[in-house]
Amino acid sequence: MDPRYGAQPQQHPHPHRTPSPGQPLQQGYQLDDNPFDDGRYGQYGPSQQHLAMPSGPDQHRLPTPSDHLNLNAAQSVDNLSGYGPPGDYAVNPEAHHDAYYNQPYEPRPQQQPYDQGYDQEYDQPYDDHRPMLQHQPSDAPSEPYQDQPQQGGGIKRWKTVKQVLLYRGNLVLDCPVPPVLLQQNPHGERDEFTHMRYSAATCDPNDFYDHDFTLRQRLFTKPRHTELFIVVTMYNEDDILFARTMTGVFKNIEYMCNRPNSKTWGKDAWKKIVVCVVSDGRSKINPRTKALLAGMGVYQEGIAKQQVNGKDVTAHIYEYTTQTHLQIKNDVVQLVHRRQPVQMLFCLKEKNAKKINSHRWFFTAFGRVLDPNICVLLDAGTRPGGSSIYHLWKAFDLEPMCGGACGEIKAMLGTGGKYLLNPLVAAQNFEYKMSNILDKPLESAFGFISVLPGAFSAYRYVALQNDKNGKGPLEKYFLGETLHGGSDAGLFESNMYLAEDRILCFELVTKRNCHWILQYVKSATGETDVPDTVTELVLQRRRWLNGSFFAAIYAIVHFLDFLRSDHTFLRKFAFFIEFIFNTINMIFAWFAIGNFFLVFKILTTSLGDDTLLGRTGEILGVVFTWLYGVFLITCFVLSLGNRPAGSGRLYTAMCWFWAIIMIYLLFAAIFIAVKAIIADVNDANGFNFADIFKNKVFYMLIISVMSTFGIWLIASLIMLDPWHMATSLVQYMLLTPTFTNVLNVYAFCNTHDVSWGTKGDDKVEKLPSVNTKDGTGKTDLPDEGDLNAQYQRELAVFAQKHVEVKTTPTPSQLQEKQMDYYRGVRTGVVLIWMVSNFGLAALVLSSAGLDRISPNKDKDHEAEQLSRSNIYMSIVLWSVAGLSAFKFIGAMWFLVVRMFRGV
């Protein structure tokens, strides 16, 4: 933390944050009333008067002394001495047009108490129920507010030139929200509802605080403590995806505000929550999404600037406390007014710099100013459950050592599960479910989750901080931004940081002299849409597989880093067991393509035995073997030279072929096992039911496979979530060869591609600039009529259902950057992978002679081959069953702990 934090003499009975939110302060805060007061956040003198704004119909909100917010706008220099009577605004809004803008708030070097410049009555303790100002009833007689103010002085709209004051070169404007929006929501004279605050950041995120930028929460008479800091990162998501996420966030905030008996939450819980939306590139944001933000009052067109005093603006920051929520009806987003207030922070980055840069703005720029307790990460399109964010927070509240947590990611299945009709969606649904039933609970039981998904996870802010030497989790996390920004980086590191969230988890748990753990919170759910076409799935899994594979290698190689942590010996031993388990899984993942071919070859060849299919089985075995080779080679050729988007039909055809292969393999396994049982039944020595389990073929094929399925079913039933076994198991089984062959082949053949797939043209419309002399400059700002007209235009953008318009790709999007070095290393990785897998197949099929499985026990010369075949098949199939059993044990322990923990 910055050494200037906490420099103010201690005036609070609890001058420091408690070690854990599990022991909340009596006042309900985990932080001082003024933890950052070093004089940088002084208040204005008594000459600053407040601008009275028209109250909303029928009701208004009463501000409290602690909620007093200084007007923080760029005012006309002609009105610096003060404003006219506040009440005149309601009579003629145009007459006080300039009064919207007053001196921009900026920190002062000297230290000042919070009550400076106010009446002496504020020296007494804060009373949230005592109004700061004498409010007039909203239904008091007054002239109705006019949406179309009178034209004044021949000034052209959108060309209202204002002189603004800058402090140390920072442009900060407090802009009035459109009157038509203001009339829809209750408000008083508190300008967090009546004004939108714009800051033009001209610095790197790491320098945001040092360059004297601040945020609204620090400007109140009693700075608001941020308990929950929620970030929604987006690129070019449309209004439906954005509204889906924001709807879930708003429901969570309402849920926390409706917990009157909570020590932390309650009626004013929204004051402790800040929702940050970071959009990756001004040229990339979806126009409908931008219009939606404008409809909420968070964004205004025509305010942003390109440069300030010759310095390029890196991010446009809009702050507003909105009372306008969203709802989706018939694929159209609608605004819902008069809802729970939500503190919004919208950061529109000037250039596209990828998601990791968006997180750097969130953590290092805004997080340093607000110093939140818990940070929640969401992707636009992920919809959290109605109380999921609360349950994530509760996990930190109950466990002081919890440094990070994640919930259950669900596949979006549509109304009545209609998306399950798509086999790809059903297969991914099964994947997600089993991961949340077996994998995540196992890792949570050990205390180390290999990846907290960036789409829906949470971290304790203090746990992420670097040490005094600048080393720590965030330092390692943001290293990936420079690696992908053009600096010299090896292929290993570049691919590893495709899964930068895995690196963050590892560095958090192994943090020096700390003992943070990671937890899975089953009661917290997040719903996301999954790829519904083969090409989208291939592109998504390329980054997932490569990133997770190289990150797993990084974790295994750096396992000794756990020794630098402050974990107990028992916890470190548990980590050791978990890493052995992860190493075994990684070995199986490396040899997955070889193992699948061996199982295929052994089963199909065995069907050619005279006691099985005979000549028909031999012919089918040869045909399927040739087709297997052709389609596998096709996978390599497509992966090495073609874009999936241009080869969609071929990839779809391969999915169908591998599904047919899987059907044939399932038939072979069942048919061979049944024939083996029949042979035992017809044995001349008589039949005993126990002999079935002594039959090696039945024991190897049926028991091992069914034990895996049985574990899946039992675990799903115990978790009270078994429906995917009925709706998605068959699709998952049929697409398993596609996951093994198509996705793995494409991922390894494209290890040279270290992009997120979001590169593009950064050309964007130029914005006006501001140049100042002696801290004073001129800029164009809209008047009230402009605000209303602009607001209506923004509403019209998303009023109708979106119609997809096909656009011609730009030349820059069609060109591929030449990466000879990466492609050379890619070739080496693919060759090693292919040779090792083919070597395994050759060893088993040629050297060991394990090319047949036959239930016929009369041929003595095949006894040795059968024995060795059983050995190999037993190792493969029972290893799968054993790994599933290990996950099952971990999941059961997770349930036992969860019964006592409560979340």
Swiss-Prot record:
Source organism per UniProt: Fusarium oxysporum f. sp. lycopersici (strain 4287 / CBS 123668 / FGSC 9935 / NRRL 34936)
Function as written in the Swiss-Prot or TrEMBL entry: Polymerizes chitin, a structural polymer of the cell wall and septum, by transferring the sugar moiety of UDP-GlcNAc to the non-reducing end of the growing chitin polymer. Plays an important role in nuclear sorting or distribution.
Gene, per the UniProt record: chs1
Family from the record: Belongs to the chitin synthase family. Class I subfamily.
Transmembrane segments: 444-464, 543-563, 573-593, 619-639, 654-674, 700-720, 729-749, 828-848, 875-895
Record-listed E.C. numbers: 2.4.1.16
Low complexity: bias regions: 100-117
Name used for this protein in its record: Chitin synthase 1
Any Pfam family the entry gives: Chitin_synth_1
